[in-house]
Amino acid sequence: MQIAVDLITFLNNPRPTMKKLLITLFAGLGISVQAQYWQQSVDYTMDITMNVENHQYDGYQKVQYTNNSPDTLQKAYFHLYFNAFQPESMMDVRSRTIVDPDRRVTDRIYGLGSDEVGFQEIRELTQNGMPLGWEVNGTVLKCTLAEPLLPGESTTFEMRWNAQVPKQIRRSGWNNKEGVEFTMTQWYPKLAEYDEDGWHPDQYVGREFYGVWGTFDVTVHIDKSYVLGGTGYLQNPEDVGFGYGGVKKVRLGRNELRTWHFKADRVHDFAFAADPDYKHVQLQIENGPLVHLLYDPKTANEANWIKI
């Protein structure tokens, strides 16, 4: 504190040459620190087909990853968060053995049946069109790059996988306590963060998430009775209905899936919720954003939602 006081006194002292020198020094220091800062970036393009009967989905994603670090990268890591929701997983064992477990978890993972566990099974992974080998350890996939990723350059991963959505215990899953059929967060193979300390391929045991900020272009094909809300902006309200874009109803074939297309920029994750009982209302705030409300009339206080 005394140093700060002395500095203010010095700057107020009428010695222009020294004052100018000191201000220039601080300005240069700020520019230097800013010039040294870097952050990785990623762009996801996904196409997802949901099976609402068995709570599984087939996924494809193209991931463009830009290396803004000063380092050459020889490998990459992806998080497979759904793998945590299996008996004997690291998260399960931890939740059953620590002194103060999360009351939402305790031994619930251990009791999940084969149709209630979560998993993500990778079927194909390439880098710039070249096949990659990979190994999975719990909730982390590790791959060695076919081509090193140099500083300032970008590379493209393509991945196909099958996943089963777990019965909800924490953030993500099906049939949560509010009765929502699908609550989807951290649900796709997610590229791990790389920063000044290196890669962060942390096993998921129920703590917060650290990942790359980026853009998401996500297409979800799902049973036509389901209403979705997702991160970002819906791109095809005319194909969806349910009040999006003022469109009430869109007729589809008997067994046809409804396609939802969302885009989101500069976000940390893409999440969505889906339920056949959702009611959707959109409200334009004066001089503000367009707000979307989704609720189940059977479980929510609909009168209060209407007042909003």
How would you name each of these model-derived features?
Residues M1-W38:
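Bacterial Sec-dependent N-terminal signal peptides
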Residues V33-D58, E178, T185:
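N-terminal, polar/Ser/Thr-rich
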Residues T66, R103-G179:
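A surface-exposed beta-strand-loop module
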